[in-house]
Amino acid sequence: MKIVVIQGPNLNMLGIREQNIYGPMKLEDIHKQMKGFAEQNKLEIEFFQSNLEGEIVDRIQECIGDADGIIINPAAYTHTSIAIRDAIAAVQLPTLEVHLSNIHQREEFRHKSLIAPVCAGQIVGMGPFGYHLAMVGMTQILSEVAAMREQQAKAQAAAQQK
């Protein structure tokens, strides 16, 4: 199974910008930890970061037929991007939204996520550990999806034998 991790604007600056909010860990280090989890759990993982909304939309759309789930930190686009929201809704893949900081404790304009309503879940305020939680959550979601598909296949096979 394959998970695509999509990182939004300014996340390439982690470890440099606003460490009091986002912490000292660099994006590469977060990805290294996620890759380790993926390897331990026999998952394929791919990382993508862009500061451009259209590139993020393109990558989400490219997940059709290529990925089983998406973990996304849309960063500032969380609060403004109908395009990213619509792309996630269109691909119909399990998606988890992650934020390093607790967006609900920050400036009022950050409180509303346009993305969350089309996601399976949202993890906020856990720092880099939030990505680990997202990996655990996505692993569970994908296992449940696989089990449901297996049950459906068995039911179809049984119905065809009758």
Curated annotation (Swiss-Prot):
MF terms (GO), sorted A to Z: 3-dehydroquinate dehydratase activity
Active site location: 22, 99
Keywords: Amino-acid biosynthesis, Aromatic amino acid biosynthesis, Lyase
GO biological process, one term: chorismate biosynthetic process
Binding-site list for substrate: 73, 79, 86, 100-101, 110
Site entry: Transition state stabilizer: 17
Record's keyword annotation contains Zinc: no
Catalytic reactions of this protein: 3-dehydroquinate = 3-dehydroshikimate + H2O
EC number: 4.2.1.10
Pathway the protein contributes to: Metabolic intermediate biosynthesis; chorismate biosynthesis; chorismate from D-erythrose 4-phosphate and phosphoenolpyruvate: step 3/7
Family of the protein in this entry: Belongs to the type-II 3-dehydroquinase family.
Subunit structure: Homododecamer.
Matching NCBIfam families: aroQ, PRK05395.1-2, PRK05395.1-3, PRK05395.1-4
Function comment: Catalyzes a trans-dehydration via an enolate intermediate.
Protein name as it appears in the record: 3-dehydroquinate dehydratase
